Amino acid sequence: MLRVYELKGSGWPRNLPDKGLEGIWPEPPFYYLFYRKESAEPILEWLKSRPDWLLTARYDLPYDKWQDICLPQISLGSFNIGLSADPPADKPDRMAILIDPGVVFGSGLHPTTQGCLLAISEIFGSDEIVMALDFGAGTGVLAIACALAGAKFVLAIDRNPLALKTAWKNARANGVADRIALVEADRLGCLNIRPDFFVMNLEWPIIEKTLAAGEWRNARRVVLAGFLESRLESVKRFARPEFQVDSVIERQGWPTVTLSRT
């Protein structure tokens, strides 16, 4: 059972009770603390010396209900995703991606993640990708897919330290930790790199802001997802004239767009 405590305050909640603490999900000014055990008493004690912080809500939920995921393996393109290294008997050639979602997003089941995996499978199967950049790494599933598909180096960026912690565990479990570097950041402006491949699967406000900023244009091949079909034309406008749309992969109403430099 996960115990989730919602705190409201400014800055970062430091020196929290660490016994049973799985991680912290930041959505400033709210911070969600995930514990494996009942921790209300030590948290209330922590709050006594911090008058600027409030406990605004708490939730108890089964661990497997955080993402409401089921455990059957999924085959997408050249990948097989699940909690087991054994591929399905009828698809023995698939690359296995072992994923424990922990308490962050990115199990491989969301339609946008599926679309990105299909796009990665397609692009890496026809192009040599040396360096890949995954913006919004989550559990690391897309970064791991890039490494397994042949990228020599993958830079995975996320603003959430809990996501990076989980991504690192998953990278190690998949034997690609030596090719994936994890960076805590919320924008691309702090980097000066020219990757062969760039993938971004995030919510629309962040996608729009990132596309407008323009650093993603340093890449040669691009995959974008996380928006509904109503935003598709806006994405295409950001891409032109430097990039052309190679394909649009749709999964349950969620498009994944693949772009290449013209």
Predicted regions and their residues:
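Short beta-strand micro-motifs in enzyme catalytic cores
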Residues: 3, 31, 95, 255-258
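S-adenosylmethionine
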Residues: 159-262
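Conserved SAM/SAH cofactor-binding pocket of Class I
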Residues: 109-187
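Structural motif
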Residues: 95, 131, 196-197
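N-terminal auxiliary segments of SAM/dcSAM-dependent transferases
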Residues: 1-90
